[in-house]
Amino acid sequence: MKKVVILGSTGSIGKNALEVIRKFPDKFKVLGLAAKSSVNILEEQIKEFNPQYVAVFDKKACDELRKKVKNLEILKGNEGICKLAKLKEADIILSAIVGAAGLIPTFEAVKEGKTIGVANKESFVMAGELIKKQGKISGAKIIPVDSEHSAVFQCINGCNKPYIKKIWLTASGGPFRGKKSYEIENVTPQEALNHPKWKMGKRITIDSATLMNKGFEVIEAHYLFDMPAENIGVLIHPQSIIHCLVEFIDGTYLAQMSNPDMKAPIALALSFPERLPEIVPPIDWSITTKLQFEIPDTEVFPCLKLAYEALNAGGSMPAVLNAADEVAVEAFLSGRLKFKEIYKIIKKVMDAHKIVSVSSIEEVLEADSWARKMAKKEIGE
Protein backbone atom coordinates (compact mmCIF):
# COMPACT_ATOMS: atom_id res chain seq x y z
CA MET A 1 0.00 0.00 0.00
CA LYS A 2 1.40 3.40 -1.01
CA LYS A 3 1.39 6.25 1.48
CA VAL A 4 0.42 9.47 -0.33
CA VAL A 5 0.92 13.12 0.57
CA ILE A 6 -1.19 15.60 -1.42
CA LEU A 7 0.01 19.20 -1.50
CA GLY A 8 -2.99 21.19 -2.70
CA SER A 9 -5.69 18.70 -1.71
CA THR A 10 -8.61 21.16 -1.97
CA GLY A 11 -7.87 22.18 -5.57
CA SER A 12 -8.95 20.49 -8.79
CA ILE A 13 -5.99 18.07 -9.01
CA GLY A 14 -6.13 17.28 -5.30
CA LYS A 15 -9.84 16.45 -5.39
CA ASN A 16 -9.36 14.22 -8.45
CA ALA A 17 -6.48 12.43 -6.72
CA LEU A 18 -8.68 11.73 -3.70
CA GLU A 19 -11.36 10.34 -6.03
CA VAL A 20 -8.80 7.85 -7.35
CA ILE A 21 -7.67 6.97 -3.82
CA ARG A 22 -11.29 6.55 -2.70
CA LYS A 23 -11.79 3.98 -5.45
CA PHE A 24 -8.70 1.96 -4.46
CA PRO A 25 -8.53 1.89 -0.64
CA ASP A 26 -6.46 -1.30 -0.76
CA LYS A 27 -3.71 0.41 -2.77
CA PHE A 28 -3.38 3.88 -1.21
CA LYS A 29 -3.33 5.46 2.23
CA VAL A 30 -3.52 9.25 2.62
CA LEU A 31 -0.58 10.16 4.84
CA GLY A 32 -0.81 13.94 4.59
CA LEU A 33 -2.96 16.74 3.19
CA ALA A 34 -1.98 20.38 2.63
CA ALA A 35 -4.08 23.32 1.45
CA LYS A 36 -3.94 27.08 1.23
CA SER A 37 -7.12 28.20 3.00
CA SER A 38 -10.20 26.11 2.09
CA VAL A 39 -10.99 25.03 5.64
CA ASN A 40 -14.43 23.49 5.06
CA ILE A 41 -13.28 21.26 2.21
CA LEU A 42 -10.14 20.25 4.10
CA GLU A 43 -12.16 19.40 7.21
CA GLU A 44 -14.35 17.01 5.18
CA GLN A 45 -11.24 15.43 3.62
CA ILE A 46 -9.72 14.91 7.07
CA LYS A 47 -12.90 13.19 8.29
CA GLU A 48 -12.99 10.83 5.31
CA PHE A 49 -9.31 10.01 4.76
CA ASN A 50 -7.92 10.32 8.31
CA PRO A 51 -4.43 11.65 7.45
CA GLN A 52 -1.64 11.65 10.03
CA TYR A 53 -0.39 15.05 8.92
CA VAL A 54 -2.18 18.24 7.82
CA ALA A 55 -0.79 21.65 6.90
CA VAL A 56 -2.57 24.93 6.07
CA PHE A 57 -0.69 27.81 4.45
CA ASP A 58 -2.97 30.64 5.55
CA LYS A 59 -2.51 31.56 9.25
CA LYS A 60 -6.14 32.55 9.88
CA ALA A 61 -7.47 29.46 8.11
CA CYS A 62 -5.06 27.26 10.08
CA ASP A 63 -6.29 28.68 13.39
CA GLU A 64 -9.89 28.12 12.29
CA LEU A 65 -9.22 24.48 11.36
CA ARG A 66 -7.43 23.87 14.67
CA LYS A 67 -10.63 24.86 16.47
CA LYS A 68 -12.66 22.40 14.38
CA VAL A 69 -10.25 19.45 14.39
CA LYS A 70 -8.95 18.67 17.88
CA ASN A 71 -7.30 15.26 17.63
CA LEU A 72 -4.68 16.17 15.02
CA GLU A 73 -1.62 18.41 14.90
CA ILE A 74 -2.18 20.95 12.12
CA LEU A 75 0.96 22.57 10.79
CA LYS A 76 1.02 26.18 9.66
CA GLY A 77 2.44 28.13 6.73
CA ASN A 78 5.00 27.24 4.09
CA GLU A 79 7.17 25.61 6.74
CA GLY A 80 4.37 23.19 7.59
CA ILE A 81 3.73 22.34 3.95
CA CYS A 82 7.45 21.75 3.38
CA LYS A 83 7.50 19.37 6.34
CA LEU A 84 4.83 17.28 4.60
CA ALA A 85 6.81 17.42 1.34
CA LYS A 86 9.79 15.81 3.10
CA LEU A 87 8.03 13.08 5.10
CA LYS A 88 10.30 10.03 5.15
CA GLU A 89 7.41 7.56 5.33
CA ALA A 90 5.71 9.00 2.21
CA ASP A 91 5.90 6.81 -0.91
CA ILE A 92 4.78 9.61 -3.22
CA ILE A 93 4.30 13.35 -2.92
CA LEU A 94 1.64 14.80 -5.23
CA SER A 95 2.66 18.41 -5.85
CA ALA A 96 -0.58 20.15 -6.86
CA ILE A 97 -0.31 23.62 -5.33
CA VAL A 98 -1.16 26.20 -7.99
CA GLY A 99 1.33 28.85 -9.05
CA ALA A 100 4.65 29.99 -7.61
CA ALA A 101 3.52 28.93 -4.12
CA GLY A 102 4.22 25.33 -5.11
CA LEU A 103 7.88 25.90 -5.95
CA ILE A 104 9.53 25.63 -2.53
CA PRO A 105 7.57 22.53 -1.35
CA THR A 106 8.31 20.82 -4.68
CA PHE A 107 12.00 21.69 -4.44
CA GLU A 108 12.14 20.43 -0.84
CA ALA A 109 10.65 17.10 -1.93
CA VAL A 110 13.23 16.88 -4.72
CA LYS A 111 16.07 17.62 -2.28
CA GLU A 112 14.78 14.82 -0.07
CA GLY A 113 14.96 12.37 -2.99
CA LYS A 114 11.23 11.63 -2.97
CA THR A 115 9.04 10.23 -5.72
CA ILE A 116 7.00 13.24 -6.83
CA GLY A 117 3.94 13.46 -9.02
CA VAL A 118 4.34 16.96 -10.43
CA ALA A 119 1.13 18.80 -11.30
CA ASN A 120 2.64 22.17 -10.36
CA LYS A 121 4.12 23.09 -13.75
CA GLU A 122 5.14 26.52 -12.42
CA SER A 123 7.94 24.84 -10.45
CA PHE A 124 9.57 23.73 -13.70
CA VAL A 125 8.80 26.99 -15.48
CA MET A 126 10.49 28.99 -12.73
CA ALA A 127 13.33 26.70 -11.71
CA GLY A 128 13.51 23.74 -14.09
CA GLU A 129 17.30 23.70 -14.32
CA LEU A 130 17.73 23.81 -10.54
CA ILE A 131 15.16 21.05 -10.01
CA LYS A 132 16.90 18.85 -12.60
CA LYS A 133 20.32 19.34 -11.00
CA GLN A 134 19.01 18.72 -7.50
CA GLY A 135 17.11 15.65 -8.66
CA LYS A 136 20.30 14.10 -10.06
CA ILE A 137 22.04 14.67 -6.73
CA SER A 138 19.23 13.33 -4.53
CA GLY A 139 17.91 10.59 -6.80
CA ALA A 140 14.39 12.03 -6.78
CA LYS A 141 11.97 10.41 -9.21
CA ILE A 142 9.67 12.82 -11.03
CA ILE A 143 6.47 11.60 -12.67
CA PRO A 144 4.55 14.24 -14.66
CA VAL A 145 0.86 14.73 -13.94
CA ASP A 146 -0.03 17.24 -16.67
CA SER A 147 -1.97 15.20 -19.23
CA GLU A 148 0.39 16.08 -22.10
CA HIS A 149 3.59 15.40 -20.18
CA SER A 150 2.17 12.19 -18.77
CA ALA A 151 1.41 11.21 -22.37
CA VAL A 152 4.98 11.95 -23.50
CA PHE A 153 6.34 10.11 -20.45
CA GLN A 154 4.36 7.03 -21.49
CA CYS A 155 5.35 7.25 -25.17
CA ILE A 156 9.10 7.61 -24.60
CA ASN A 157 9.44 5.31 -21.57
CA GLY A 158 12.18 2.84 -22.53
CA CYS A 159 12.87 4.60 -25.83
CA ASN A 160 16.37 5.57 -26.99
CA LYS A 161 16.48 9.37 -26.93
CA PRO A 162 18.55 9.80 -30.15
CA TYR A 163 15.61 8.27 -32.05
CA ILE A 164 13.24 11.04 -30.93
CA LYS A 165 13.05 13.92 -33.39
CA LYS A 166 10.27 16.06 -31.92
CA ILE A 167 7.62 16.16 -29.21
CA TRP A 168 4.20 17.58 -30.10
CA LEU A 169 1.98 18.79 -27.27
CA THR A 170 -1.70 19.12 -28.09
CA ALA A 171 -4.09 21.86 -26.97
CA SER A 172 -7.86 22.02 -27.31
CA GLY A 173 -7.60 25.64 -28.42
CA GLY A 174 -9.72 26.79 -25.50
CA PRO A 175 -13.03 28.67 -25.70
CA PHE A 176 -11.78 31.14 -28.35
CA ARG A 177 -10.36 28.73 -30.91
CA GLY A 178 -10.95 30.02 -34.44
CA LYS A 179 -11.71 33.57 -33.30
CA LYS A 180 -10.11 36.67 -34.80
CA SER A 181 -8.13 39.00 -32.58
CA TYR A 182 -10.81 41.71 -32.58
CA GLU A 183 -13.48 39.17 -31.56
CA ILE A 184 -11.81 38.43 -28.22
CA GLU A 185 -10.84 42.00 -27.32
CA ASN A 186 -13.67 42.43 -24.80
CA VAL A 187 -14.48 38.89 -23.67
CA THR A 188 -15.54 38.51 -20.04
CA PRO A 189 -13.87 36.32 -17.40
CA GLN A 190 -16.96 34.10 -17.47
CA GLU A 191 -16.57 33.53 -21.21
CA ALA A 192 -12.86 32.80 -20.81
CA LEU A 193 -13.57 30.33 -18.00
CA ASN A 194 -15.93 28.31 -20.22
CA HIS A 195 -13.39 25.69 -21.32
CA PRO A 196 -14.81 23.28 -23.92
CA LYS A 197 -13.07 20.12 -22.67
CA TRP A 198 -11.34 20.30 -19.28
CA LYS A 199 -12.58 21.11 -15.78
CA MET A 200 -9.73 22.97 -14.09
CA GLY A 201 -8.94 25.78 -11.67
CA LYS A 202 -9.50 29.40 -12.68
CA ARG A 203 -5.93 30.43 -13.41
CA ILE A 204 -5.09 27.43 -15.59
CA THR A 205 -8.40 27.85 -17.45
CA ILE A 206 -7.57 31.48 -18.32
CA ASP A 207 -4.03 30.43 -19.26
CA SER A 208 -5.58 27.83 -21.56
CA ALA A 209 -7.73 30.53 -23.17
CA THR A 210 -4.62 32.65 -23.92
CA LEU A 211 -2.51 29.55 -24.79
CA MET A 212 -0.03 30.62 -22.10
CA ASN A 213 -0.69 27.31 -20.38
CA LYS A 214 0.59 25.50 -23.44
CA GLY A 215 3.62 27.78 -23.42
CA PHE A 216 4.30 26.82 -19.81
CA GLU A 217 3.99 23.18 -20.85
CA VAL A 218 6.60 23.70 -23.58
CA ILE A 219 9.02 25.00 -20.93
CA GLU A 220 8.16 22.12 -18.60
CA ALA A 221 8.68 19.58 -21.40
CA HIS A 222 12.09 21.10 -22.16
CA TYR A 223 13.29 20.32 -18.63
CA LEU A 224 11.44 17.04 -18.09
CA PHE A 225 12.56 15.43 -21.35
CA ASP A 226 15.81 17.28 -22.17
CA MET A 227 14.44 18.55 -25.48
CA PRO A 228 15.49 21.87 -27.03
CA ALA A 229 12.74 24.43 -27.66
CA GLU A 230 12.85 23.95 -31.43
CA ASN A 231 12.09 20.25 -30.96
CA ILE A 232 8.90 20.87 -28.98
CA GLY A 233 5.86 21.79 -31.05
CA VAL A 234 2.24 22.65 -30.29
CA LEU A 235 -0.82 21.45 -32.20
CA ILE A 236 -4.41 22.55 -31.71
CA HIS A 237 -6.53 19.41 -31.39
CA PRO A 238 -10.11 20.38 -30.46
CA GLN A 239 -11.28 16.85 -29.61
CA SER A 240 -8.63 16.53 -26.81
CA ILE A 241 -8.37 12.78 -27.46
CA ILE A 242 -4.70 12.68 -28.47
CA HIS A 243 -2.59 14.21 -25.69
CA CYS A 244 0.79 14.10 -27.40
CA LEU A 245 2.59 12.94 -30.50
CA VAL A 246 6.19 11.77 -30.38
CA GLU A 247 7.87 12.06 -33.78
CA PHE A 248 10.80 9.74 -34.50
CA ILE A 249 13.74 10.18 -36.88
CA ASP A 250 12.33 7.56 -39.27
CA GLY A 251 9.18 9.62 -39.89
CA THR A 252 6.90 7.54 -37.65
CA TYR A 253 4.87 8.76 -34.66
CA LEU A 254 3.58 7.45 -31.34
CA ALA A 255 0.43 8.98 -29.86
CA GLN A 256 -1.17 8.62 -26.43
CA MET A 257 -4.96 8.75 -26.46
CA SER A 258 -7.81 8.81 -23.96
CA ASN A 259 -10.97 10.70 -23.15
CA PRO A 260 -10.06 14.04 -21.53
CA ASP A 261 -10.07 13.39 -17.79
CA MET A 262 -7.33 14.42 -15.36
CA LYS A 263 -7.92 11.29 -13.29
CA ALA A 264 -6.02 9.28 -15.93
CA PRO A 265 -2.59 10.97 -15.54
CA ILE A 266 -3.14 11.36 -11.78
CA ALA A 267 -3.87 7.64 -11.36
CA LEU A 268 -0.82 6.71 -13.42
CA ALA A 269 1.45 8.95 -11.33
CA LEU A 270 0.09 7.46 -8.10
CA SER A 271 0.29 3.83 -9.21
CA PHE A 272 3.35 3.85 -11.53
CA PRO A 273 4.70 1.50 -12.78
CA GLU A 274 1.34 -0.24 -12.38
CA ARG A 275 -1.90 0.78 -14.10
CA LEU A 276 -5.27 0.88 -12.37
CA PRO A 277 -8.46 -0.44 -14.01
CA GLU A 278 -11.42 1.63 -15.20
CA ILE A 279 -10.12 5.11 -14.38
CA VAL A 280 -11.74 6.80 -17.37
CA PRO A 281 -14.37 5.50 -19.80
CA PRO A 282 -12.93 4.11 -23.04
CA ILE A 283 -13.19 6.10 -26.25
CA ASP A 284 -16.44 5.45 -28.10
CA TRP A 285 -15.24 5.16 -31.69
CA SER A 286 -18.81 5.21 -33.02
CA ILE A 287 -18.99 8.84 -31.83
CA THR A 288 -15.34 9.90 -32.12
CA THR A 289 -15.00 9.64 -35.88
CA LYS A 290 -12.93 12.76 -36.60
CA LEU A 291 -9.62 13.96 -35.14
CA GLN A 292 -8.54 17.46 -36.21
CA PHE A 293 -5.17 19.19 -35.96
CA GLU A 294 -4.29 22.84 -36.57
CA ILE A 295 -1.22 25.01 -36.17
CA PRO A 296 -1.85 27.62 -33.41
CA ASP A 297 -2.35 31.22 -34.54
CA THR A 298 0.24 33.11 -32.50
CA GLU A 299 -0.96 36.45 -33.88
CA VAL A 300 -4.29 35.91 -32.13
CA PHE A 301 -2.70 34.10 -29.17
CA PRO A 302 0.73 35.75 -28.76
CA CYS A 303 1.26 34.47 -25.21
CA LEU A 304 2.50 31.20 -26.71
CA LYS A 305 5.31 33.12 -28.43
CA LEU A 306 6.25 34.79 -25.14
CA ALA A 307 6.80 31.39 -23.54
CA TYR A 308 9.18 30.30 -26.30
CA GLU A 309 11.00 33.64 -25.99
CA ALA A 310 11.36 33.18 -22.22
CA LEU A 311 12.65 29.63 -22.64
CA ASN A 312 15.21 30.69 -25.24
CA ALA A 313 16.28 33.66 -23.10
CA GLY A 314 16.80 31.39 -20.09
CA GLY A 315 18.10 32.47 -16.70
CA SER A 316 15.54 34.42 -14.69
CA MET A 317 13.20 35.12 -17.62
CA PRO A 318 10.88 32.08 -17.28
CA ALA A 319 10.27 32.99 -13.62
CA VAL A 320 9.45 36.55 -14.71
CA LEU A 321 7.07 35.20 -17.36
CA ASN A 322 5.20 33.11 -14.80
CA ALA A 323 4.95 35.86 -12.17
CA ALA A 324 3.76 38.51 -14.63
CA ASP A 325 1.16 36.09 -16.00
CA GLU A 326 -0.10 35.21 -12.53
CA VAL A 327 -0.63 38.89 -11.67
CA ALA A 328 -2.19 39.73 -15.05
CA VAL A 329 -4.61 36.78 -14.94
CA GLU A 330 -5.69 37.73 -11.43
CA ALA A 331 -6.33 41.30 -12.62
CA PHE A 332 -8.39 40.00 -15.56
CA LEU A 333 -10.46 37.73 -13.33
CA SER A 334 -11.25 40.64 -11.01
CA GLY A 335 -12.27 42.90 -13.92
CA ARG A 336 -9.26 45.25 -13.76
CA LEU A 337 -7.77 44.16 -17.08
CA LYS A 338 -9.09 43.25 -20.53
CA PHE A 339 -8.37 39.81 -21.96
CA LYS A 340 -5.96 41.04 -24.64
CA GLU A 341 -4.14 43.17 -22.07
CA ILE A 342 -2.86 40.04 -20.31
CA TYR A 343 -0.32 39.63 -23.11
CA LYS A 344 0.57 43.33 -23.12
CA ILE A 345 1.35 43.40 -19.40
CA ILE A 346 3.52 40.28 -19.57
CA LYS A 347 5.37 41.63 -22.63
CA LYS A 348 6.10 44.95 -20.91
CA VAL A 349 7.44 43.21 -17.81
CA MET A 350 9.63 40.88 -19.89
CA ASP A 351 10.97 43.79 -21.96
CA ALA A 352 11.90 45.66 -18.78
CA HIS A 353 13.70 42.69 -17.22
CA LYS A 354 17.47 42.36 -17.22
CA ILE A 355 18.15 38.64 -17.32
CA VAL A 356 20.37 37.16 -14.64
CA SER A 357 21.58 33.59 -14.30
CA VAL A 358 19.95 31.74 -11.42
CA SER A 359 21.89 29.35 -9.21
CA SER A 360 19.55 29.19 -6.21
CA ILE A 361 15.85 29.16 -5.37
CA GLU A 362 16.37 32.51 -3.61
CA GLU A 363 17.46 34.09 -6.91
CA VAL A 364 14.40 32.62 -8.64
CA LEU A 365 12.15 34.10 -5.95
CA GLU A 366 13.88 37.49 -6.32
CA ALA A 367 13.02 37.50 -10.03
CA ASP A 368 9.48 36.41 -9.19
CA SER A 369 9.07 39.24 -6.67
CA TRP A 370 10.48 41.84 -9.06
CA ALA A 371 8.13 40.74 -11.85
CA ARG A 372 5.06 40.85 -9.60
CA LYS A 373 5.83 44.40 -8.51
CA MET A 374 6.49 45.48 -12.09
CA ALA A 375 3.28 43.85 -13.36
CA LYS A 376 1.20 45.52 -10.65
CA LYS A 377 2.82 48.85 -11.50
CA GLU A 378 1.94 48.41 -15.19
CA ILE A 379 -1.65 47.52 -14.28
CA GLY A 380 -1.82 50.65 -12.13
CA GLU A 381 -2.12 49.07 -8.72
Curated annotation (Swiss-Prot):
Annotated binding of NADPH, by residue: 10-13, 120, 122, 201
InterPro entries per record: DXP_reductoisomerase, DXP_reductoisomerase_C, DXP_reductoisomerase_N, DXPR_C, DXPR_C_sf, NAD(P)-bd_dom_sf
Sequence positions that bind Mn(2+): 146, 148, 217
Annotated Gene3D superfamilies: 1.10.1740.10, NAD(P)-binding Rossmann-like Domain
GO molecular function: 1-deoxy-D-xylulose-5-phosphate reductoisomerase activity; manganese ion binding; NADPH binding
Pathway participation: Isoprenoid biosynthesis; isopentenyl diphosphate biosynthesis via DXP pathway; isopentenyl diphosphate from 1-deoxy-D-xylulose 5-phosphate: step 1/6
Keywords: Isoprene biosynthesis, Manganese, Metal-binding, NADP, Oxidoreductase
Catalytic activity: 2-C-methyl-D-erythritol 4-phosphate + NADP(+) = 1-deoxy-D-xylulose 5-phosphate + NADPH + H(+)
Residues bound to 1-deoxy-D-xylulose 5-phosphate: 121, 147-148, 172, 195, 208, 213-214, 217
The UniProt record lists the keyword NAD: no
CC cofactor: Mg(2+); Mn(2+)
EC number: 1.1.1.267
Keyword Zinc on entry: no
GO biological process: isopentenyl diphosphate biosynthetic process, methylerythritol 4-phosphate pathway involved in terpenoid biosynthetic process
Function: Catalyzes the NADPH-dependent rearrangement and reduction of 1-deoxy-D-xylulose-5-phosphate (DXP) to 2-C-methyl-D-erythritol 4-phosphate (MEP).
Family: Belongs to the DXR family.
Name of this protein: 1-deoxy-D-xylulose 5-phosphate reductoisomerase
Gene (UniProt): dxr
